[in-house]
A protein has these predicted regions:
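Membrane-helix interface segments
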Residues: 1-4, 55-63, 87
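"…centered on the first transmembrane helix and the immediately adjacent amphipathic helix/loop
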Residues: 1-50
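Residue-level signature of the transmembrane alpha-helical core
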Residues: 10, 17, 39, 44, ...
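Alpha-helical transmembrane segments of multi-pass membrane proteins
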Residues: 15-20, 46-50, 66-74, 97, ...
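Transmembrane helix-loop junctions in multipass membrane proteins, especially transporters and channels
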Residues: 21-28, 54, 78, 82-86, ...
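Short, flexible micro-motifs
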Residues: 23, 40, 73, 84, ...
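Interfacial helix-loop-helix junctions of multi-pass membrane proteins
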Residues: 29-35, 73-95
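Membrane-interfacial alpha-helical segments at the cytosolic side of multi-pass membrane proteins
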Residues: 40-55, 59, 97-108
Length: 109
C-alpha cells in the first residue's frame, strides 16, 4: 500500500511539472485562479508526502525540495517563450507547501 501511495505522490509531482511547462495549461475561469491552483497543487503535494513520511526532518527536506521545484519551474517557464515567469506563482507554491505542512502537523496531533 505504501509503495502505491509513494508512486501516486511522484506521479502527482510529475503532473505538476508537466502542467507547469505545457504551452496551454487549463485556466480557471476567474481572476488569479491560477494562483489558487498553485497553492492547492503544492499544498496537496506537501500534505501527501507528510502523510507518507512522519519524521519532521524528512518533511522539512521535502518541503524545501517542493519550494525549490516551484522556483525552478517558474524560471523554466520564463525560458520557454510560451509561458511567463511570475514571482506571485512562486509565492503561491511556497505558501501551499507551508499550508500543506501545517495542516498535516495539525491533523497529526
Amino acid at each position: 500500500m505504501r509503495a502505491a501511495l509513494l508512486a501516486g505522490g511522484w506521479a502527482y509531482a510529475a503532473a505538476i511539472v508537466f502542467l507547469s511547462l505545457t504551452p496551454n495549461p487549463p485556466h480557471p475561469g476567474f481572476e488569479h485562479g491560477d494562483k489558487l491552483g498553485h497553492l492547492l497543487a503544492y499544498g496537496l503535494l506537501m500534505f501527501w508526502f507528510c502523510y507518507l513520511y512522519r519524521y519532521r526532518y524528512t518533511q522539512l527536506a521535502y518541503g524545501i525540495g517542493w519550494i525549490a521545484l516551484g522556483i525552478a519551474l517558474e524560471f523554466a517557464q520564463g525560458a520557454t517563450g510560451t509561458r511567463s515567469f511570475e514571482v506571485a506563482d512562486m509565492a503561491a507554491d511556497s505558501l501551499g507547501v507551508l499550508l500543506g505542512w501545517g495542516i498535516s502537523a495539525t491533523l497529526r496531533k
